[in-house]
Amino acid sequence: MSESEFQAHTTRSAPEASQALLQGLQDQVGFVPNLAATMAESPALLSAFLGLRSAAGCGSLSPVEREVIAIAVATETGCTYCVAAHSTFALKCGAPAAAVEAVRVGRDPEDARLEALARFARAVVRRADVGPPVRRLRGSG
């Protein structure tokens, strides 16, 4: 199956087992992201993705912090779709627009904690020496 054969579903066009999952996501974030809309073809895949998303939300990082990490990773890996999607989510979570823009273009945000998280995420993606970013992250609280 080629990429062009994947359908991005709506809450109405998705298989029945995916409809409620998509509706719940739409209720949470205000829209159905294309990634989830495409995953909806397989209710098991969509359910697993949403379960992982939910589990990630149970950690000690705030939604803004998680999205800053996601933007930094997406920027490093060159995933323009992911940069756009996570920027939207970050702003919806209340991230400062200046911080989102800084991370999108590979700069550090002014907030010390967000800076430490972005630097750490970039270092991990680059497989660089993570010692200095880890110390900075620990020092930021």
State where each predicted segment sits.
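Hydrophobic alpha-helical segments
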Residues: M1-G141
